[in-house]
């Protein structure tokens, strides 16, 4: 199984993102934001930030390629059961920030996914949840 860092829009179908449908490819690839994929299996979008965002607007403001405090997982999806968890397990060892936190929608599915995969809820916000993963 090969993990890739996306460098071209042809490598990922962002229209398949069930959570962040309106987020353009350019946004996902600028200011410290990246996309990782296990081709045809799973995708995760990350952002490096100096502060913990609780909204997508804050994520946009706080994203910075020089940030070393947080890696934010703001969307993850898979095409087959189990690959969402697998891509997180592949990506975490590659990251070099102090903390690994999600910006998750307020859904039961997000709670189940992240808690089953070892994350701890650290913040219940007006528009989102933040779960923290540990290496």
Question: What does each of the following model-derived ranges do?
Answer:
Residues 24-42, 48-52:
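A short helix-loop-beta-strand connector motif used in the catalytic cores of GNAT acetyltransferases and
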Residues 33, 68, 96-97:
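Short, high-confidence coil segments that cap the C-terminus of an alpha-helix
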Residues 105-128:
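Conserved active-site alpha-helix within GNAT-family acetyltransferase domains
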Residues 1-27:
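Short amphipathic alpha-helix that is part of the acyltransferase structural core
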Residues 95-106:
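Conserved GNAT acetyl-CoA-binding A-motif
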Residues 78-94, 116:
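Conserved acetyl-CoA-binding loop-helix of GNAT-fold acetyltransferases
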Residues 41-71:
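Conserved acyl-donor/pantetheine-binding loop and adjacent beta-alpha core of acyl/acetyltransferases
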């Amino acid at each position: 199984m090969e993990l890739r860092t996306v460098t071209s829009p042809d490598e990922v179908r962002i229209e398949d993102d069930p959570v962040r449908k309106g987020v353009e490819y350019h946004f996902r690839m600028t200011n410290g934001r990246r996309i990782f994929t296990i081709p045809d299996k799973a995708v995760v979008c990350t952002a490096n930030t100096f502060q913990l965002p609780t909204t997508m607007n804050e994520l946009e403001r706080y994203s910075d390629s020089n940030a070393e405090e947080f890696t934010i997982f703001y969307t993850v999806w898979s095409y087959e059961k189990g690959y969402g968890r697998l891509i997180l397990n592949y990506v975490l060892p590659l990251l070099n920030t102090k903390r690994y936190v999600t910006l998750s929608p307020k859904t039961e599915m997000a709670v189940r996914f992240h808690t089953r995969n070892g994350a701890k809820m650290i913040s219940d916000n007006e528009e989102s949840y933040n779960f923290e993963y540990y290496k």
